[in-house]
Structure formats: structure tokens, C-alpha cells
């Protein structure tokens, strides 16, 4: 990846052109909600973390309402390693026993979330951290993982949940008070248990419930790639099904693309997978006409 651009070296006239290009997009998204799934390198490299914080602050300042749903897989793996426990995944989902769930809760709801909140606040924004347990935000139920090798059978992967319902009242209240919500993907079940929910799934469901104008999912790759490593810039539901069938989309990309497609089918107007390794990727996708990442379409 190329070295980051030194903005101080950009000529004033070019800066003005950049701002002028952003104006129609600011008008389009003014007053609208944009849900951002935040994860990957953008959460671990200091330069990218600071760039992301500034991006969401700018969106809020120009009247766009960002809602952040964050992951934290590498941080969870690191914490598990410290206690001598290895992470196990099935079909892109983390197997979560009781001990792992305790680690997930304090890593996501504590360390990772607070790092994001503090960074946004440090640069002049007003962020508030939530888990799905706060304000009854995310009602969850145990996820039954279909066993692909044994049709009709299911695999028990522990305290892994799926979204049963979302109560967006607390998120809307924060938006109305000019705050930026930062949400950890932990839900609560009627059985009294906490559930680890894939952050991509939470972001997609939340975008649908909030009637978001855009869902943006950040990854460590340029977007959805074909088997030859070429970027696929535009994918329909039929094309995605074919990529599932031939194994092009697999592992951790399975829940991401499934969630993106579900959101598109449920009325989210614009769904994009973007490369979070690119500095200011959020602003590039939302406020410029530059084609970026992969657009997911429902038809």
C-alpha cells in the first residue's frame, strides 16, 4: 500500500475542488443514518484509527448520523491466548463457551469499545459506548448452526447468538442529542445469558431497523474478490449466490456478505464492502464519486 498523503502538501485550489466534490453527497446524506461496521486493520493501526475517528466526527459535523458497530476478533484472540485458550471458528463464527463469553464481554464491551469512544472524544467528537444489553438494544437467541455435512442436523457453538429483535430507541435518543453511538455486538437472551453475535450481522440488522441510507462494512481486503484475485465492484443477489456455491466467498466473508445482502433486500439503499486499510476510506466512499470497494445489490 502506498504511503499516506500529506494533506499539508495539497494545493489550496485542489483542497477546494475536493470540498466542492463532496457537497452533493453531503446534501444527499444530510439528516440520514449511515451504519459502519468497523473492524480489521482500521482498528489496530494507529494512523488508521485516528483517521477513522476524524472521519466519523466530520460526518456528524455536516449533518450525517454515523452509527458504529465494531468487531474485535484479534483482540479477543490475544486475550484468550493470555489465558492459554485457542480460538475456534466454524463457518466464520467463533465457538463461544462460558469462559470465552466472559472474555468476549470484557474485551468488546470494555477495552475495544472504550478505545474507540476515547479516540473520537479526543478529536472533538461526542461518542457514547453501548453493548446490546444497554437499553434493551439487542434481543438475542441462541444460533443454531446448520451442519453442512449432515442435513437436518445442527452444530452447538455455545453462546453464539443471532439477532431476534432490535430496540433502536437508545440509539435514536443518542443521535438526537448529537452523540455518535459505538455499539459492541453482545446481545441478551430471554434465558438470561449473554450472547456473542457476529458484528457484521448486528450492523446489517441495525441498518435495516434504523432505515439507514447506507451500510458500510470495512475489511482488510479491497472488497469481494474473484478466484483470480480481481475486485468485483458490483454484485447482485444471483451473483452472490453463485460465489457462495463455488466457494469463492468463504470463512469470515460468509456472514459479512450474507448480512450485506440481507440489508440490501430489506431496504437499505446503499450497501458497500470497503478496504479499511486505506486511510479515510469512510469519507472516500461516502463523500466522493470515486468507485470504491464492492457494492451489494438486492437484484
From Swiss-Prot:
Main subcellular location of this protein, as a coarse class: cytoplasm
Subcellular location field: Cytoplasm
Site (Transition state stabilizer) residue list: 37, 256
Matching PANTHER family: N-ACETYLGLUTAMATE SYNTHASE, N-ACETYLGLUTAMATE SYNTHASE, MITOCHONDRIAL
Task of the protein: Catalyzes the ATP-dependent phosphorylation of N-acetyl-L-glutamate.
InterPro entries per the UniProt record, alphabetical: AceGlu_kinase-like_sf, AcgluKinase_fam, ArgB, Asp/Glu/Uridylate_kinase, NAGK-C
Keywords: Amino-acid biosynthesis, Arginine biosynthesis, ATP-binding, Cytoplasm, Kinase, Nucleotide-binding, Transferase
Pathway: Amino-acid biosynthesis; L-arginine biosynthesis; N(2)-acetyl-L-ornithine from L-glutamate: step 2/4
E.C. numbers: 2.7.2.8
Protein's UniProt name: Acetylglutamate kinase
SUPFAM superfamilies per the UniProt record, alphabetical: Carbamate kinase-like
Reaction catalyzed: N-acetyl-L-glutamate + ATP = N-acetyl-L-glutamyl 5-phosphate + ADP
GO-annotated molecular function: acetylglutamate kinase activity; ATP binding
Residues noted as binding substrate in the record, renumbered to the chain: 72-73, 94, 196
Gene Ontology terms: biological process: arginine biosynthetic process via ornithine; L-arginine biosynthetic process
Cellular component, GO annotation: cytoplasm
Family in the record: Belongs to the acetylglutamate kinase family. ArgB subfamily.
